[in-house]
Regions:
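Catalytic loop of short-chain dehydrogenase/reductase
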Residues: 141-163, 168-177
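Conserved Rossmann-fold SDR core element
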Residues: 29, 85, 165-168, 172-191, ...
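C-terminal substrate-recognition "lid" of short-chain dehydrogenase/reductases
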Residues: 214-241, 246-247
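Conserved NAD(P)H cofactor-binding loop of Rossmann-fold oxidoreductase domains
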Residues: 92-97, 244
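Substrate-binding pocket helix/loop in short-chain dehydrogenase/reductase
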Residues: 100-101, 105-113, 195, 206
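Active-site loop of short-chain dehydrogenase/reductase
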Residues: 10, 58, 85-86, 100, ...
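Conserved glycine-rich cofactor-binding loop
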Residues: 18-20
Length: 255
């Protein structure tokens, strides 16, 4: 899809790069010549990912809790020492659990907000201040949720991801003079390693209501992410990749 050397001499950080969409994004960046760092909380999944990604190019892994600024600072130190620069940041790390809004505990709410919103911001701020401001260039792509029509059962994550999307619009203007672009990718239901975390009946119901009658793939999300990462005149946008689902019908049953 892209020229094989498109990302030669580019350094990329993918959070949540050990599995699913993040893994595929890392793989495609490697395929097109980038030096890639992947980061995640789970060491064993990172180790497996490094083995699987090795045939595609040079990848380095770092155990990272995006909720902890000290951990992020150590990662930035490693990238600065080993590579001296960072060109592209992919904020893919996140997590949530299905629950009726009224049943979410204070701790449950804070855990999702701290990961999906605060963690995304902590990583973005550190990498921008450490690298992008110094270089007067940089590309940030956030992987968010397709919550265009709301996301019943995921109110905590819907709130956090909406915050990330508005943050992207704000930073796109605030940092435009520094040569930084900031965009979001909002996938619909994707056939990935996280799909089994949702009730099977919910998954089947949603699949039947997608105009294209299928789930998206990690490869398709990665292709869009790479496109936004290399685009120079697109910033502040949230691009939906959901098979047309947001323009057709309703996914959610009202009880």
């Amino acid at each position: 899809m892209f020229q094989k050397d498109l990302f030669n001499n580019k350094t990329v950080l993918v959070t949540g790069g050990g599995t699913g969409i993040g893994f595929e994004i890392a793989k495609q960046f490697l395929t097109y010549g980038a030096e890639v760092y992947i980061a995640s909380r789970k060491k064993e999944k990172l180790e497996q990912a490094v083995i699987q990604l090795k045939p595609f190019g040079g990848v380095k892994a770092f155990v990272l809790d995006i909720r902890e600024t000290e951990s992020i600072h150590h990662l930035a130190d490693m990238i600065d020492t080993q590579s001296g620069k960072l060109d592209i940041l992919i904020n893919n790390e996140g997590g949530q659990f299905p629950s009726p809004a009224e049943a979410i505990t204070e701790n449950g709410w804070k855990a999702v907000i701290n990961t999906n919103l605060n963690g995304t911001w902590f990583v973005t701020q550190e990498m921008a201040k450490r690298f992008f401001f110094r270089q007067e260039s940089g590309s940030i792509v956030n992987i968010v949720l397709n919550n265009f029509k709301g996301f019943p059962g995921m109110s905590h994550s819907a709130a956090a991801r909406a915050g990330v999307m508005n943050l992207a619009q704000t930073l796109a203007i605030e940092w435009v003079s520094k040569g930084i672009t900031v965009n979001c990718v909002a996938p619909g239901i994707i056939q990935s390693s996280g799909l089994e975390n949702y009730p099977p009946q919910l998954v089947e119901s949603i699949a039947s209501k997608i105009p294209m009658k299928r789930f998206g793939t990690c490869e398709e999300v990665a292709e869009l992410t790479l496109f936004l990462a290399v685009s120079k005149y697109i910033t502040g946008e949230t691009v939906y990749i959901d098979g047309g689902n947001r323009f057709w019908g309703d996914m959610w049953e009202i009880s």
